[in-house]
């Protein structure tokens, strides 16, 4: 999904060679789809401990500012990042999430941000955006 922040930023950096970012200090939390899948299994195995509770799924180490994410992507793509001080991002989400509750049960993420960025970049290299049926999974 290219509408997700990391995927969108990496795509623009690779396609255009630059990225303009507003509100660089806004915080977001991230999780890799593989870790989400692992959490489903974790939940099924720990249903008796988790029943009737609500959990944030992720890891405290995955709370990043937009600037931190951009700097990681820039190092891997050599794209120019411009942090614009004037203007606004239409997406006003700015938050840090605590994952202490699920961590206390033994769940934590395994895929770090930089590994996820590497995967996105490698996928973007093989996707033919002119072909509706291109899917990196087949390469």
Model-inferred region functions:
Residues 1-4:
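Flexible, glycine-rich beta-alpha linker
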């Amino acid at each position: 999904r290219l509408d997700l922040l990391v995927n969108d930023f990496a795509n623009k950096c690779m396609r255009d060679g630059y990225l303009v970012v507003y509100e660089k200090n806004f915080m977001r939390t991230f999780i890799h789809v593989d870790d989400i899948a692992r959490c489903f299994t974790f939940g099924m195995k720990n249903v008796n401990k988790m029943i009737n509770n609500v959990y944030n799924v992720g890891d405290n180490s995955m709370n990043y500012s937009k600037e931190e994410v951009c700097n990681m992507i820039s190092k891997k793509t050599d794209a120019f990042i411009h942090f614009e001080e004037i203007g606004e991002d239409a997406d006003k989400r700015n938050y840090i999430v605590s994952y202490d509750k699920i961590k206390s049960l033994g769940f934590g993420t395994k895929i770090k941000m930089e590994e996820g960025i590497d995967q996105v970049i490698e996928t973007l290299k093989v996707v033919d955006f002119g072909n509706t049926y291109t899917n990196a999974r087949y390469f």
